């Protein structure tokens, strides 16, 4: 499954419990079409005690969300935006904001 965002992109959540929040993409899972975004979709994980860790604990961490729930954030527009692919004169392919033509 093709994912429209890359690692270290700034994205905005457009639906779900974290709607409107922005964060940086930490990891992309192209096979499942999910992304891990910093500070978004926080879940509680119950950690069992083991030899290296003496006590059990409840840890809060990010969980992956579907890539269709995020849009790329344009720093120039200060808004979520769709992206277009543009080929420059030297043949390199870049991602461009559809609203203001800012390159990513």
Swiss-Prot record:
Disulfide bonds: none
Any one GO biological process: translation
InterPro entries, sorted: KOW (IPR005824), Rib_uL2_dom2 (IPR014722), Ribosomal_uL24 (IPR003256), Ribosomal_uL24_KOW (IPR041988), Translation_prot_SH3-like_sf (IPR008991)
Residues making up the signal peptide according to the UniProt record: none
Keywords: Ribonucleoprotein, Ribosomal protein, RNA-binding, rRNA-binding
CDD domains: KOW_RPL26 (cd06089)
Family per record: Belongs to the universal ribosomal protein uL24 family.
Protein name: Large ribosomal subunit protein uL24
Gene expressing this chain: rplX
